[in-house]
């Protein structure tokens, strides 16, 4: 009988990898539904396209590596990678953007390092950053929430915009939002960053229609949806509490300090917690067991570092949201964090 020799850690769990990946994917449903409700059918279309591309890319690499298809495709890791990347991409992005991103995530960020369990960086976020740097216009073309749209975008319009670049009536994404008051193609975080650079105060910026709520129209409920999904993951013990709690606590504390000393040029801690990809990042991205810290103390440092980096990038960086960059930078620090936080071997003195 042939036995497979695997490397450590030899962790044991009642839940298989297939089941865990499936449950994490299911936990995204509240956030996915909220994102679809406020930003249209494009979200679901991108998710479907990304999942199909991820499975095909996974099969392609497995064939090239002469690995059996069924065991690896059934673990649902490719499905989850495609899903998470699709949730971060603007809903009406061109189809080729999603295909390129997913292909990079699976082939380069995952399998180039050896496959599942060997990757140094979170594949979905590595792909997101590559897309953001390579195609900044397409990656920052977000529709405002549906309440602000003058023209209704139907399911078929979404299909045409994604695969043809124009709606059924021949309008581009920019043309469909030309009559929207305020900054139409930007997220609330982008609107804040642009407004502050123009010399406006935070209160003046938040008076724009896109801020019909303390975290931006639509984005509040999207983050609430991912928060609910994250609580489900904690309840099912699929993730450790250390990373999301330290991530959110760090972001809250730092943003609170700056809000106290400079209220006219900074946003509130609640705004930071419920804007952009905060909750998606805290519960679904940063908690990736492969690329995150492995000790409990290390997870606290790791999560706190991400929260700090998110605020720094949002406030002083070149991009409005910093979750992807923060996670990748923290991934680079994981070996150092694990080295200095590894527990003392039983029976040995510290030092």
From Swiss-Prot:
<comment type="function">
    <text>Part of a membrane-bound complex that couples electron transfer with translocation of ions across the membrane.</text>
</comment>
<feature type="transmembrane region" description="Helical">
    <location>
        <begin position="300"/>
        <end position="317"/>
    </location>
</feature>
<dbReference type="Pfam" id="PF03116">
    <property type="entry name" value="NQR2_RnfD_RnfE"/>
</dbReference>
<comment type="subunit">
    <text>The complex is composed of six subunits: RnfA, RnfB, RnfC, RnfD, RnfE and RnfG.</text>
</comment>
<keyword id="KW-1278">Translocase</keyword>
<dbReference type="GO" id="GO:0022900">
    <property type="term" value="P:electron transport chain"/>
</dbReference>
<keyword id="KW-1003">Cell membrane</keyword>
<keyword id="KW-0249">Electron transport</keyword>
<keyword id="KW-0288">FMN</keyword>
<keyword id="KW-0597">Phosphoprotein</keyword>
<dbReference type="InterPro" id="IPR011303">
    <property type="entry name" value="RnfD_bac"/>
</dbReference>
<feature type="transmembrane region" description="Helical">
    <location>
        <begin position="270"/>
        <end position="290"/>
    </location>
</feature>
<keyword id="KW-0997">Cell inner membrane</keyword>
<keyword id="KW-0285">Flavoprotein</keyword>
<dbReference type="GO" id="GO:0005886">
    <property type="term" value="C:plasma membrane"/>
</dbReference>
<feature type="transmembrane region" description="Helical">
    <location>
        <begin position="214"/>
        <end position="234"/>
    </location>
</feature>
<keyword id="KW-0813">Transport</keyword>
<feature type="transmembrane region" description="Helical">
    <location>
        <begin position="123"/>
        <end position="143"/>
    </location>
</feature>
<feature type="transmembrane region" description="Helical">
    <location>
        <begin position="88"/>
        <end position="108"/>
    </location>
</feature>
<keyword id="KW-1133">Transmembrane helix</keyword>
<feature type="transmembrane region" description="Helical">
    <location>
        <begin position="37"/>
        <end position="57"/>
    </location>
</feature>
<feature type="transmembrane region" description="Helical">
    <location>
        <begin position="241"/>
        <end position="261"/>
    </location>
</feature>
<dbReference type="InterPro" id="IPR004338">
    <property type="entry name" value="NqrB/RnfD"/>
</dbReference>
<keyword id="KW-0812">Transmembrane</keyword>
<feature type="modified residue" description="FMN phosphoryl threonine">
    <location>
        <position position="187"/>
    </location>
</feature>
<comment type="similarity">
    <text>Belongs to the NqrB/RnfD family.</text>
</comment>
<protein>
    <recommendedName>
        <fullName>Ion-translocating oxidoreductase complex subunit D</fullName>
        <ecNumber>7.-.-.-</ecNumber>
    </recommendedName>
</protein>
<dbReference type="GO" id="GO:0055085">
    <property type="term" value="P:transmembrane transport"/>
</dbReference>
<keyword id="KW-0472">Membrane</keyword>
């Amino acid at each position: 009988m042939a036995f497979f020799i695997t490397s450590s850690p030899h962790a044991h769990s009642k839940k298989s990898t297939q089941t865990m990946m499936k449950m994490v994917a299911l936990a995204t449903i509240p956030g996915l539904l909220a994102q679809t409700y406020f930003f249209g059918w494009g979200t679901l279309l991108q998710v479907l396209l990304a999942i199909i591309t991820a499975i095909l890319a996974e099969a392609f690499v497995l064939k090239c590596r002469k690995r059996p298809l069924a065991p690896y495709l059934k673990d649902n890791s490719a499905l989850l990678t495609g899903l998470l990347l699709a949730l971060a991409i603007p809903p009406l992005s061109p189809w080729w953007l999603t295909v390129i991103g997913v292909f990079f995530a699976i082939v380069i960020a995952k399998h180039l390092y050896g496959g599942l369990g060997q990757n140094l960086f979170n594949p979905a976020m590595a792909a997101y950053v590559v897309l953001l740097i390579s195609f900044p216009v397409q990656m920052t073309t977000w529709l405002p929430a549906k309440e602000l749209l003058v023209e209704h975008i139907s399911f078929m319009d979404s299909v045409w915009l994604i695969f043809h670049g124009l709606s059924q009536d021949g309008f581009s994404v920019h043309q469909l939002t030309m009559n929207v008051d305020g900054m139409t193609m930007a997220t609330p975080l982008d609107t804040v960053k642009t407004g502050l650079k123009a010399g406006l105060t935070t209160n003046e910026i938040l008076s724009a229609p896109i801020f019909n709520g303390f975290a931006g129209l639509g984005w509040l409920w999207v983050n609430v949806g991912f928060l609910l999904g994250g609580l489900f993951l904690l309840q099912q013990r699929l993730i450790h509490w250390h990373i999301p709690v330290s991530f959110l606590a760090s972001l809250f504390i730092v943003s609170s300090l700056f809000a106290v000393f400079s209220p006219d040029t900074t946003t509130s801690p609640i705004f930071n917690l419920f804007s952009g990809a905060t909750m998606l990042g805290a519960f679904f991205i940063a908690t990736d067991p492969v690329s995150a810290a492995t000790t409990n103390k290390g997870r606290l440092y790791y999560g706190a570092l991400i929260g700090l980096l998110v605020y720094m990038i949002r406030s002083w960086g070149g991009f409005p949201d910093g979750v992807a960059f923060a996670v990748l930078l923290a991934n680079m620090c994981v070996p150092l964090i694990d080295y200095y936080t590894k527990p003392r071997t039983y029976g040995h003195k510290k030092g």
